[in-house]
Amino acid sequence: MPVKFSKVLIPQPRSKFIKVRCPDCGNEQVVFSHAAMVVRCLVCGRVLAEPTGGKARLAGHVVKILE
């Protein structure tokens, strides 16, 4: 009796890098989706992402999700 081989599933990460636009100055900056620290805009200093214990809460506009 032949043995059936099942497909080996490779786990993919759920976290991603996200390009965010600052609502005040329009600067685009790359932020980690599960940021553990407060992320501020490099130009004006506004908070773009704040940690929540899992995914970060984004305050800017998401421009692109980087793969």
Swiss-Prot record:
> Zn fingers (C4-type): where?
22-44
Q: Which GO terms describe its molecular function?
A: structural constituent of ribosome; zinc ion binding
Note on cofactor? Binds 1 zinc ion per subunit.
Q: Report if keyword Ribosomal protein is assigned.
A: yes
Keyword annotations for this protein, in alphabetical order, are:
Metal-binding, Ribonucleoprotein, Ribosomal protein, Zinc, Zinc-finger
Q: Which GO terms describe its biological process?
A: translation
> What positions does the entry give for Zn(2+) binding?
22, 25, 41, 44
Cofactor(s) needed for function: Zn(2+)
A GO CC term assigned to this protein in UniProt: ribosome
The record ties this protein, via HAMAP family, to: Ribosomal_eS27 (MF_00371)
Describe, as the record does, how this protein assembles with itself and its partners.
Part of the 30S ribosomal subunit.
Q: What NCBIfam families does this protein's entry cite?
A: PRK00415.1
Q: Which family does it belong to?
A: Belongs to the eukaryotic ribosomal protein eS27 family.
Protein name in the entry: Small ribosomal subunit protein eS27
List the top taxonomic levels of the source. Archaea, Thermoproteota, Thermoprotei, Thermoproteales, Thermoproteaceae
Q: Which gene encodes it?
A: rps27e
